[in-house]
Amino acid sequence: MSKEEVLLRIQAVLDQVLDAKGIPRVKLSEDVAVMDGTLPIDSLDLAQIVIELQSVTGRDPFRNGFVEFRTVGELARLFAA
């Protein structure tokens, strides 16, 4: 899965999360910070996104411990082939 495909998947899961919360959708870009308050998500929402990415890509970049990432683009690169 390319980085662009991963970004689209992140957007799709984020849309589902926000729809379930009744929060307006947010358009992502690679430079959007994940957990600084820019996105209206919490750590459980982020975990849901990560689990979905692991499922669709077959990758687990966190297998050996936490890998730091700050932006949506950095997260996408962790899962891109």
Where are the regions a protein language model picked out?
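Phosphopantetheine-dependent thiolation modules in NRPS/PKS and related acyl-activating systems
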Residues: 1-41, 45-51, 55-81
